[in-house]
Amino acid sequence: MDRKYRILIVDDEAPLRAGLQTYLELEGYEADTAASAEEALTLDLRSYDLILLDIMMGDMSGIEMAAKLKADKATADLPIIFLTARDSDDDMVSGLNLGADDYIAKPYSIKNVLARIGAVLRRSDRRK
């Protein structure tokens, strides 16, 4: 990894956030967490290279947060990978049509998550 990428993990499940953060940091990423979409939206999201975003959360879903990000010129190009326990084609298509860069169904293997993160970041770097 040439530079340290910043990744934000947005998920309402604390053990999942902590586990992902640990694995990402062991792989050389800088990883921050937010327990909700509302909390994430208070951060300077432009400082991140990628967001791992759970779809099913409390007051605001990951889909709603992604729509806000894509509607804002400052964050419209920010790569998003959806994480969800709902593994339906309709959910996957909705997320990808909204502008997500990938979609990972829970439960997942960390190797799969790391490979997908790497692929999305490589594509994002080529677009810059």
Model feature map: region roles:
Residues 14-32:
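Two-component/phosphorelay signaling modules centered on CheY-like receiver
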Residues 17, 53, 58, 67, ...:
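The feature encodes the CheY-like receiver
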Residues 11, 54, 84:
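Active-site residues of response regulator receiver
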Residues 33-50:
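Acidic, metal-coordinating helix/loop segments flanking the phosphotransfer/catalytic sites
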Residues 35-36, 61-64:
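Acidic catalytic/metal-coordinating carboxylates
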Residues 4, 47-49, 74-79:
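His-Asp phosphorelay/catalytic-motif detector in bacterial-type signaling
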Residues 108-121:
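C-terminal output helix
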